């Protein structure tokens, strides 16, 4: 059954690539109502770009047991299967969006492109040299925009890019990289000032995409960083309430207050700018507190890893610790590894982004943006 599933996946993939090649050899033809999906961000959104850069295994997931439940092989996604953008693409009736750096990436990008890089942040300095930072991801998007202008002309490309939707997830690694690299809880002496820099970089990237023609944007905010298994392992026994009061979770909340303020400001400044913002922080805390309410059995311990909460980042045995545990039923868990959701949890978050009400997603959801 597993081999049949893989075969079907590859048949679909090669069919799409063949269509792309045919299009690239003739005139590019895009349906008038086609809305593509462009993706920027970190490991929550990365579908394998880090497979193609010189980095460390901590920033890669191209080994088992990653990818085992859906693809039946590791794809570079930090999940047992699909990640959030995969489900968003499905809901938008688009095929899976390949990583931009994949050699057979969509040649004309009529469905969009995924630039996300695991471990990256909004700041160039965050894990510099081992990831593709948000600014570089934006520069890759500009290359795509330039190609589209050659194929469609300036007017056609602008119209296509205006119909498209851009989803962005950034910030978590900027805070985590600093706070977990330094032993002192005072590693960020001016938290609000640091948040302002991160938010400023995200704003700059949004405006760059807007200048190219982008008008419809989707965002998820930063999760409760100290409540991830990888962080709770360091303070074993801390309650879910307590971990939200620790430094990284506290700065995440500062970020999450600043992000909507910035977006509202851009909405006033940029004509036609529309956005959707999903409260990933609250949605994740809700799953962790009440897993059974959403069909899970375990909300705090990871499925794959070792140590307390299975939070030692050993999943797959390729990151310096060879021994690791793998749970029996992955779908029972919110977390797959020490800091990433299972496919089932990712689908839950994607659904909130797609059709979520104002409790978690506002002022629009992604479905509304795609239909505009």
Task: Locate each region found by the language model.
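Conserved active-site regions of diverse hydrolases
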Residues: 2-372
């Amino acid at each position: 059954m597993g081999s049949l599933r893989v075969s079907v996946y590859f048949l679909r993939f090669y069919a799409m690539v063949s269509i792309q090649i045919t299009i690239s050899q003739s005139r590019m033809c895009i349906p008038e109502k086609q809305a593509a999906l462009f993706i920027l961000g970190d490991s929550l959104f990365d579908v394998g770009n880090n497979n193609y850069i010189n980095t460390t295994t901590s920033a890669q997931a191209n080994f088992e047991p990653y990818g085992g439940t859906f693809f039946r092989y590791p794809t570079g996604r930090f999940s047992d299967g699909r990640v959030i953008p995969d489900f968003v693409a499905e809901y938008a009736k688009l095929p899976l969006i390949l990583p931009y750096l994949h050699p057979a990436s969509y040649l004309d990008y009529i469905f969009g492109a995924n630039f996300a890089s695991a471990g990256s942040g909004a700041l160039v300095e965050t894990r510099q040299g081992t990831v593709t930072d948000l600014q570089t991801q934006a520069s890759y998007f500009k290359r795509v925009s330039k190609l589209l202008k050659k194929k469609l002309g300036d007017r056609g490309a602008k119209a296509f890019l205006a119909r498209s939707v851009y989803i962005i997830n950034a910030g978590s690694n900027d805070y985590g990289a600093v706070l977990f690299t330094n032993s002192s809880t005072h590693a960020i002496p001016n938290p609000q000032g640091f948040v302002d820099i991160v938010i400023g970089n995200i704003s700059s990237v949004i405006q760059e995409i807007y200048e190219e023609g982008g008008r419809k944007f989707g965002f998820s905010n930063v999760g409760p960083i100290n409540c991830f298994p990888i962080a709770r392992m360091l303070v074993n026994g801390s309650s879910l309430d307590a971990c939200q009061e620790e430094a990284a979770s506290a700065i995440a909340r500062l970020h999450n207050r600043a992000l909507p303020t910035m977006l509202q400001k851009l909405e006033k400044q940029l004509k036609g700018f529309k956005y959707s913002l999903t409260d990933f922080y609250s949605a994740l805390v809700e799953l962790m507190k009440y897993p059974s309410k959403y069909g899970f059995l375990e909300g705090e311990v990871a499925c794959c890893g070792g140590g307390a909460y299975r939070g030692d980042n050993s999943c797959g045995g390729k990151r310096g610790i060879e021994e690791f545990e793998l749970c029996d039923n992955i779908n029972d868990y919110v977390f797959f590894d020490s800091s990433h959701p299972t496919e089932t949890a990712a689908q839950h978050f994607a659904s909130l982004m797609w059709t979520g009400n104002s409790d978690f997603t506002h002022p629009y959801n992604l479905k509304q943006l795609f239909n505009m």
